[in-house]
Design a protein with these regions (language model features):
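SAM-dependent transferase fold signal centered on methyltransferase-like domains
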Residues: 1-357
Length: 357
């Protein structure tokens, strides 16, 4: 099992290769990354048998930026019929697994395998359980089968607490009809990724206040309002009337880069289309100067050197806070609902909660 297989957004295979190569160098794992453009996946082939496992044990998956999912394992060829027997034969080299996910890459060809995987999963699950290779136990490794075609599959392992929350890293979120734009799903996904679900009632509740910079028409504002927050929406464009009718939104026509609240707020969110360095500087200012305790900000990516630019900005933010003696939690992820961008989350750890409204 010397191969680490990773899913990603189509077109970002190179960023995954750069990021995982950085990780391998940091952990002294020898090998090489490879990927084909627009295939929505990448591999890191280790020269040592335990290399892929060392990569996974040395890194929290949630802290990676561009991979959507990962697993360590092997590629196997499948016959046209009796695929299950071949998979069971290879399971001799795998431990007892606690769950099973069948996956496919996020391409048109991959999506065509969706129906096959749905039909095949039930039969495979029964066979694995009958063979004593699968039980229901979240503490045991997850068996991840990524089908490249009906004839080729990557058989992989990942720990359920150190891999994607959803198959292929694609969230199953339902678009709320009341929300004024589909961008609302981006903020909801960010919360799922950056905030443990059992902390939502503590960190996203109705006694809080928030600011949405570049708010119109209100996709992100809707998420804050849906949690019961009192929101100041900053945008020169119009907000959805349905949001204004809630009585929880104050709309100010102002520049999102110059506006500052008179009193600290709990949350600042921003999806303004601007150069990533400018949005990163604004994020650092809001958290560093105490204008908010938590923030979610999108960084639009350049055409080239995208991983290098994100890494540079994150290091600049971290170094800035360290120099000022400010304790923060920094996260960054290319979410499923992101396009040519990444989503950053910052949480200040050394300030008291603002007074309730």
């Amino acid at each position: 099992m010397n191969t680490l297989f990773m899913h990603c957004r189509p077109g970002f295979e190179g960023e995954v290769c750069s990021e995982i190569s950085d990780l391998a160098a940091r952990l002294n794992v020898a090998g090489y990354a490879k990927a084909k453009a627009a295939t929505a996946c990448a591999e890191f082939v280790c020269t040592e048998e335990d290399g892929a496992e060392r990569l996974m044990r040395g890194q929290r998956f949630a802290e990676l930026i561009f991979p959507r999912q990962w697993a360590r394992g092997i590629f196997i060829d499948l016959p046209e019929t009796d695929r299950i027997s071949v998979i069971l034969a290879h399971m001799a080299d795998f431990p007892l697994c606690g769950s099973l996910w069948l996956e496919m890459v996020d391409t048109n060809d991959g999506k065509e395998l969706s129906n096959f995987c749905k039909k095949f999963e039930g039969h495979l699950r029964k066979a694995l359980m009958a063979a004593g290779k699968l039980v229901e136990d979240a503490h045991k490794p997850r068996l991840l089968l990524t089908f490249k075609s009906g004839r080729e599959v990557f058989m992989g392992l990942a720990e359920s607490n150190n891999s994607a929350m959803w198959p292929m890293g694609i969230p199953r979120l339902k678009f709320p009809r009341e929300a004024p734009s589909r961008s609302t799903l981006k903020l909801e996904e960010a919360w799922h990724h950056f905030i443990p679900r059992d902390q939502w009632d503590e960190r996203l509740h109705g006694d809080m206040t928030g600011v949405d910079l570049g708010a119109a028409p209100g996709g992100w504002t809707w998420q804050l309002v849906n949690r019961g927050m009192l929101v100041t929406a900053i945008d020169n464009g119009p907000m959805a009337e349905s949001l204004m009718d809630t009585g929880l939104v104050q709309h100010l026509m102002a520049d999102g880069f110059t506006f500052k609240p008179k009193q600290p707020v709990d949350w600042m969110v921003c999806d303004i289309v601007e150069k990533p360095a400018r949005n990163a500087a604004m994020l650092e200012e809001w958290i560093g100067d105490g204008h908010c305790r938590e923030a979610v900000v999108n960084l639009k990516l350049p055409m080239k050197q995208r991983y290098a630019e994100v890494k540079r900005l994150l290091e600049r933010i971290a170094d800035g806070f360290k120099a000022r003696g400010i304790r923060v939690e920094i996260g960054c992820k290319q979410l499923y609902h992101d396009r040519e961008e990444v989503t950053c989350h910052l949480r200040r750890l050394d300030v008291k909660k603002p007074k309730s409204r």
